Every structure is written in C-alpha cells, then in structure tokens.
Amino acid sequence: MILTIDEVLTAEELAEMKDVLATADFVDGKTTAGWHAKLVKNNTQLAGKAACSMDLKERVKSALLRHPLFKVAIQPRSIHTLLFSRYQEGMSYGDHVDNAFMGGARSDVSFTLFLNAPEDYTGGELCVELADGVHTYKLAAGSAIAYPSSTIHRVETVTSGTRLVAVGWVQSLVRDVQQRELLFDLDTARRSLFATHGKTPEFDLISKSHANLLRQWAE
C-alpha cells in the first residue's frame, strides 16, 4: 500500500525548517547507505552531529504522529533513522531497496516528507516499483508519501534547482503490508458507517473485527 498524506507540516513549520537547513552542514549521503546502495546514491544529507539535527527530527516525528491518517494506516511502533536529504543539480539515487534493519529497529514502512515545492526543481521524482508498474511521486511541500520498505525505488536525477526532503523509516505494530491494508480498510469503512448512521450493530461488528485482528497481528 502506498499512501500520500497531505499537510503533515504547516506553512510555518516548513518555513522554520527550511531556514534552519539553509545554513546547516550537509555531508555526502553515501555515509548512511548500505554497501550496495552506495554505488547508486548521489546526494547530500544533514550531518548527524549538526546542532539542529535532533530538534528537526523530533519536529518531523511529532508532525507525523499527530496526523490521524498516518497513525491509522501505518500503525507505528517507532519512527527511526530520520535523515534530511538534499539533491542539487545532477544528483540522484538509483534503484535500491532499504535495509531490513536500521538502528536496531525493523524497517516496515519508508516515508519521504517533501520540504520544498515541486516548482523549485525539475526532475527528482520518487519512483516506486510495484507489481503493476512504476509509480512516480513529486508532492507539494509539507506532504508525505509512505510505502513498503520492501519495494525497489529510486530518485530521478535533479536537472535544475534543489530537492529537499526528510526521509525515515517506521517499525509498524503490524509488519505485514497486506494485514495493515486490511486493517486500514476496515477502519475506513467503520468510520464512514459511523458518520452516516451512528453507532449501529453493523458498526460494532466491524469494530470488533478490527480490534480482534489488530490484537492477533500486532507485535
């Protein structure tokens, strides 16, 4: 399941982050890539020892966790290994799959949070390979895309301007993507039913199934 999430960050939060990152120290992105991904990774990222790093990471985590769609669809146990990546002209990240574990946590869901407008750069699309083909994304500033960490994906070459994003990984309470999607569908259905008809016996049955499946699958 690929999920686009609008307005994760407010305009004020975006402006503050971009101001901080504009003067921050960026280093070669290969330093955090796996041994095979280093061959195709060409970007820069906020230095891990940068004074602003911890604060910015906490801001992103808080913004995601307050968003109801993120919580319902992803079922996050923890958000980990956050990076702030910058792609300037000529930079890209070729086909790769994310590591199964990062920082001692399992990577179930990957996300990209866009920090500047798509008009600020050309190229730089995020491409995710699924069974039905390649899906391409270039979202508005403040919006995020979440997708299974098990997929092959890439960032196309930036041909002009600068692409600025926050990327990170989530260990979910429910590791299986199909189970997460089923839980999300049930939750969406019961909320729609409740909005239309209130707390009915049918609503209670769907809620029972949702709760019991989550109880069975959650880790």
From Swiss-Prot:
Gene3D superfamilies, alphabetized: q2cbj1_9rhob like domain (2.60.120.620), Rabenosyn, Rab binding domain (4.10.860.20)
GO molecular function: 2-oxoglutarate-dependent dioxygenase activity; iron ion binding; L-ascorbic acid binding
Residues reported to bind Fe cation: H96, D98, H153
Cofactors demanded by this protein: Fe(2+); L-ascorbate
Enzyme Commission code: 1.14.11.-
InterPro entries in alphabetical order: Oxoglu/Fe-dep_dioxygenase_dom, PKHD_C, PKHD_hydroxylase, Pro_4_hyd_alph, Pro_4_hyd_alph_FE2OG_OXY
All copies of domain Fe2OG dioxygenase, residue ranges: 78-172
Cofactor binding notes: Binds 1 Fe(2+) ion per subunit.
Superkingdom, taxonomy of origin: Bacteria
Keywords: Dioxygenase, Iron, Metal-binding, Oxidoreductase, Vitamin C
Residues bound to 2-oxoglutarate: R163
One BP annotation, GO: DNA damage response
Pfam families (UniProt xref): 2OG-FeII_Oxy_3, PKHD_C
HAMAP family from the UniProt entry: Hydroxyl_YbiX
Name under which the protein is recorded: PKHD-type hydroxylase AM1_3707
Source lineage: Bacteria, Bacillati, Cyanobacteriota, Cyanophyceae, Acaryochloridales
